[in-house]
């Protein structure tokens, strides 16, 4: 039998340390690495083994050498036994990994046995570092694909909203726990960072194009947009999108504390959610509402609280009517919004929003219901 790595166990009475060193030196062209130790404090722990050797449990075993060899190329066990002048059955194939065998020299992986000092090991390489590194790699082994996924989660390239675009169902099943931990790690990391976020307040009558403009802004910025739900938990389905559109936001959906945190540009604060805290990592928040900014904020604040701090955070104010869009920017000196520009409201034209003709309406009804209104009943 040919082996690339092997172990020899030889009684101390059959070979001396000097002889071992001589053999290793003579065969150094064939032997890549070696490590050996004398076990002279082992005891019988198994009653059957002790009886077979005429001993009792607790008696000290005969001193013996453990010799571990790694060759440059495979060697026949017959020749190896001849080198050490021992029987071939004392040359054995290492079961498991070489690193485990190396740690067994000092019984590091068998705490029930006598623990030998690592200084008692004689070797021509850093056996301990190799063994520990191999054990570490196995314990925390990750394939290249998992590593790629985790690094992309940490960098923000993969988020909860686009996770299905980046992994398949098999990867999700295999790596689900690791992926969940990676998202939690990123959340903890985000809490430490300064958030670079802007806030836009858009107001106007229903049908004026507020939501359309909000979506257009997000699209033009290449942001994935989360549009808030109609429930009291407006962030129920938020999954890390770069833009949050609080569409047709009602003042009773948020308390002062949560609104301040949501618009806070200094930290990635957690915002109260019905099921769990949501960490806002968005770069843009857009509020749309039919109410003016003063009426909206006055509904939220108590009489003794100022709305200035929230106006200051909503630096861009956009007012829309059927004809024009008014763009204003917060003036921190005069504490008011300055009108910067008035532009024609072409939102409906730009997005080709129009009413259907009678024929188009009939065609639509037929397409979804298979009802042909031009046929007699």
From Swiss-Prot:
Keyword Transmembrane helix: no
GO CC terms, sorted: extrachromosomal circular DNA
Record keywords: ATP-binding, DNA replication, Nucleotide-binding, Plasmid
Positions of ATP binding: 204-211
GO biological process: DNA replication
InterPro entries in the cross-refs: Helicase_SF3_ssDNA/RNA_vir, P-loop_NTPase, Plasmid_rep_OBD
Gene Ontology molecular functions: ATP binding; DNA binding; DNA topoisomerase activity; RNA binding; RNA helicase activity
Purpose of the protein: Is essential for plasmid replication. Nicks the positive strand at the plus origin of replication.
Homology family: Belongs to the Gram-positive plasmids replication protein type 2 family.
Record protein name field: Replication protein
Organism: Onion yellows phytoplasma (strain OY-M)
């Amino acid at each position: 039998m040919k082996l690339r790595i092997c172990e020899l166990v030889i009684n101390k009475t059959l070979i001396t340390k000097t002889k071992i060193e001589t053999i290793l030196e003579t065969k150094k062209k064939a032997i890549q690495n070696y490590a050996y130790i004398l076990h002279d404090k082992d005891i019988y722990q198994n009653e059957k083994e002790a009886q077979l050797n005429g001993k009792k449990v607790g008696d000290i075993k005969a001193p013996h050498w453990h010799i571990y060899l790694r060759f440059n190329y495979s060697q026949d066990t017959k020749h190896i036994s001849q080198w050490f002048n021992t029987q071939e059955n004392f040359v054995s194939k290492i079961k498991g990994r070489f690193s485990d065998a190396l740690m067994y020299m000092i019984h590091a992986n068998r705490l029930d046995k006598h623990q030998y000092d690592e200084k008692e090991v004689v070797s021509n390489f850093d056996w301990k570092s190799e063994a520990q590194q191999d054990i570490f790699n196995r314990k925390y082994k990750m394939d290249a694909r998992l590593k790629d996924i985790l690094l992309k989660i940490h960098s923000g390239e993969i988020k909860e909203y686009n996770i299905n675009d980046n992994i398949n169902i098999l990867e999700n099943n295999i790596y689900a726990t690791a992926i969940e931990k990676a998202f939690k790690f990123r959340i903890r990391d985000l809490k430490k960072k300064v958030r670079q976020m802007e806030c836009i307040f858009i107001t106007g009558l229903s049908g004026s194009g507020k939501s359309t403009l909000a979506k257009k802004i997000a699209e033009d910025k290449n942001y994935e947009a989360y549009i808030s739900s109609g429930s009291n938990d407006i962030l129920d389905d938020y999954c890390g999108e770069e833009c949050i559109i609080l569409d047709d936001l009602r003042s009773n959906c948020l308390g002062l504390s949560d609104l301040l945190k949501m618009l806070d540009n200094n930290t990635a604060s957690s915002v109260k959610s019905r099921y769990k805290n949501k960490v806002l990592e968005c770069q843009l928040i857009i509020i749309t509402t039919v109410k003016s900014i003063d009426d909206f904020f006055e509904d939220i604040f108590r009489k003794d609280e100022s709305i200035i701090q929230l106006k200051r955070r909503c630096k861009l104010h956009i007012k829309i009517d059927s004809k024009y869009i008014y763009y204003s920017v917060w003036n921190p000196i005069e504490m008011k919004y300055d009108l910067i520009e008035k532009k024609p409201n072409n939102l409906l034209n730009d997005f080709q929003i129009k009413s259907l003709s009678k024929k188009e309406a009939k065609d639509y009804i037929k397409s979804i219901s298979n009802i042909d209104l031009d046929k007699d009943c």
